Curated annotation (Swiss-Prot):
This is Thymidylate kinase. InterPro entries: P-loop_NTPase, Thymidylate_kin-like_dom, Thymidylate_kin_CS, Thymidylate_kinase. ATP binds at residues 13-20. It comes from Shewanella loihica (strain ATCC BAA-1088 / PV-4). Belongs to the thymidylate kinase family.
Amino acid sequence: MKQNSAKFIVIEGLEGAGKSSAIALVRDFIEKHNGVPPVCTREPGGTPLAERIRDLVKIADPNDPLCDESECLLIYAARAQLVANVIKPALAQGNWVLGDRHNLSSLAYQGGGRQLMPLVEAVSQATLKDFKPDLTLYLDIDPQLGLQRARDRGALDRIEQQALSFFERARATYLQLAARDESIVVIDASQTMAQVHKEILAVLQRQDWS
């Protein structure tokens, strides 16, 4: 595989959209395409420091509640660490990278959900500049259905416990951003898993991976 052929693919979506199964599908596709598995990451997280930040963001501390601005800045600190120490080095070595969330999550969740878009855009530009995925698959689902699926999995984390209106704003932002960026493909995640996977494979197969 040529070094300049390495791609960065990201799976995005609200809680309960089916990201985990989609990631497994795309990972298998990449491994069959390249003969080697991709480097898999998750956000926030993916490095020892970023995983510690993940715990701060995901686990509520009733004695020291995390304010919205701190949440945003912590997530970008984790992302900057991951991009610098894992994603960019992997791509430079010719390895494909498959991400469970990336910057689009912050634009949707902190920018739309928390209504902090000016802060998110400023920090995004400062930390990432023009770095972005080659392809993002956004699994779109009605927030009520997604949250019910998340509840069925078990206890909800701090982010998953946010009000329905938070996720409605996040979804609206996801769709607005997807409408103006051709590298973001919207997949209807309310379908059966088989239908969702069929759509994902169709998207992957029609990409120019040269």
